[in-house]
Amino acid sequence: MGTRYISALLIALSISLNLSAQKKSKGPIIKEYGAVWAIEQPDFKVDTTKTFRAVFDIMNSPESHDKVNASIETAARFLNMHAQSGVPAENLKAALVVHNQASKDIISDTAYQKRYGTANPNSELIKALQHAGVDIIFCGQSSNARGFPKEDLMEGVQLSLSAMTALIHLQDQEYRLIKF
């Protein structure tokens, strides 16, 4: 084998080992969801003294009825990445405003089972977010338009007049809109 080939192989192996050493980690706020990468020495620094308020506009959902909604898990990533970066948990405020296709993702396991033949894959994530103080707000217009009555919602989910109303109120309270 040539020296060039061995050098290239060693470089590739070194890069591979370095990449495999980098792993996403969950927690400390949401322990089972929201894995994030640690970013060593970022140029754009995180102000660990400020209060972060984020409202997540959750409208999309996977077509599969047995997959966790990645948009909802984004709230767990938000909490975990900032806590891992030194922001105290009490300085992290989050809310989800759920509507449109994502309406199904916040109904109880019983209601989900009746409609889709399986437990709601988002139940544990929603409970963990609520336990961490995240408000889950459901659009009343989607409730009626999509046929998800208040009694079908998971415990603790708040019904609002509309997603628009909730988003305006939260932004008036200095929550910053996160929409993907």
What are these model-predicted stretches?
Residues 1-23:
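Bacterial Sec-dependent N-terminal signal peptides
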Residues 7, 22-32, 112-113, 118-180:
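A cross-taxonomic marker for long C-terminal extensions/tails that follow the last structured domain
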Residues 31-52:
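N-terminal targeting signals for Sec/Tat export/insertion, comprising classic cleavable signal peptides
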Residues 47-63, 106-110:
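Acidic/histidine-rich, surface-exposed loop or edge segments in extracytoplasmic proteins
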Residues 53-57, 94-98, 135-138:
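Structural recognition of the beta-strand scaffold that forms the well-ordered cores
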Residues 57-68, 113-115, 156:
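Second-shell loop/turn segments in exported
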Residues 68-87:
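Histidine-anchored nucleotide/phosphate-binding helix
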Residues 88-106:
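Acidic helix-start/capping segments at beta-turn-to-alpha-helix junctions
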